[in-house]
Amino acid sequence: MKYFVVLFLVLFNYNVVGQIKVDNVGDGWVDKVNQAITLIKKVDSEKYDKLIEVCDHVTFWNGNFSTSENDHTIMISQSDILRGSVNNVAAVLVHESRHLMFRKLGIKMSEIDEETMAYIYELDFLQKIPGVEPFLIENARKRIVNPK
């Protein structure tokens, strides 16, 4: 019975999509992440497989930008969620999964080179989304040229 209670508490605080646990912080954020993960799976199964391979936890924070933490967690910024775009959240997940993949493989490079590679990966994904918001494509292209 004790194990059942622990399992219940863990599942109560997380929403699990495939193998990724998404922290439940309310305000529809979990739904937005779930929609983004579904979009990635539909649009680019290879990037979805990589995401599932390297990420097992999505959380949120109040920072100005999304990032990754340790070797398996993607932290989505409040500002990225509040933009209201599922495509943007999907782009964040794809972008940050690239950073996690580099860590997993032990690939070391300069921060600027790593950001450039992550934006190239993100842009490749964005260009496959029918009707994607132009500002997302423009931002990725701009960041490839000037990653900072």
PLM region spans:
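Auxiliary, metal-adjacent structural segments of Zn-dependent hydrolase domains
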Residues: 17-73, 81-82
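Short pre-active-site segment immediately N-terminal to the catalytic Zn-binding motif
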Residues: 76-93
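Sec-dependent N-terminal signal peptides
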Residues: 3-12
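Surface-exposed, polar/charged faces of alpha-helical domains
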Residues: 84, 106-109, 131
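Post-HExxH zinc-binding segment in Zn-dependent metallohydrolases
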Residues: 111-146
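Extracytoplasmic/secreted proteins, especially bacterial periplasmic and envelope-associated proteins
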Residues: 32-35, 88, 92, 113, ...
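Active-site recognition of the HExxH zinc-binding catalytic motif
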Residues: 91-104
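Structural recognition of the beta-strand scaffold that forms the well-ordered cores
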Residues: 75, 100-102, 119-120
